[in-house]
Design a protein with these regions (language model features):
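Residues at beta-strand starts and edge strands
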Residues: 17-19, 30-32, 44, 132, ...
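Membrane-embedded segments
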Residues: 47, 52-58
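Beta-strand elements of well-folded, non-transmembrane domains
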Residues: 25-29, 38-42, 52-54, 140-142, ...
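Ordered hydrophobic segments in well-structured contexts
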Residues: 35, 47-49, 111
């Protein structure tokens, strides 16, 4: 399925109860692995926290309406362009995506494309359970950035 960019529903649904994902982030020569914790706060703010398994905070972001707030972020990622890319990625993940289009879709996976050239992003969704993707891979081909999210279930910590 291809076509013009249309408003697509969020890839992941933020909820009042914390959702946890295994996080693997590769940026240039840096590799980080840990956990992504996402929670919708009572005022509809979405908190996005990335940390290592040992508790070191990688980043702490807030999405409120269409505003992206950097509460904290480690040095290799604290560059203006990098934060802008992460802002776009997290908005595409948790808010309606206005500029994305579905490139491929089947019963087992979906691929969405957002942006062009330097800002091109490929979202690959798979492992659907009740319409929600259990695995999400975000790739930025031109800047060697890859983010892999695997949902952690209560039964499978």
């Amino acid at each position: 399925v291809t076509g013009e960019a249309t408003a697509l529903p969020p890839i992941l649904q933020a909820e009042a109860q914390s959702q946890k994902y295994n996080l693997q982030l590769d940026f240039m020569k840096h590799h980080f692995s840990g956990m992504l914790i996402v929670r919708q706060m009572p005022d509809n703010e979405i908190r996005i926290l990335g940390s290592t398994y040992f508790g070191l905070s990688l980043f702490d972001f807030s999405l409120h309406c269409d505003t992206f707030i950097v509460n904290s972020c480690i040095e290799p990622m604290r560059k203006k362009k990098m934060l802008k890319i992460l802002e776009t990625d997290f908005k595409n993940l948790f808010l309606k995506s206005e500029k994305a289009r579905i490139k491929k879709k089947s019963s087992t996976f979906e691929q969405r494309i957002s942006g062009k050239g330097f800002g091109k992003t490929v979202f690959t969704l798979s492992g659907f359970v009740n319409g929600q993707a259990e695995k999400v891979q975000i790739k930025h081909p031109l800047i060697r950035l890859r983010i892999q999210l695997d949902k952690l279930n209560i039964n499978n910590p």
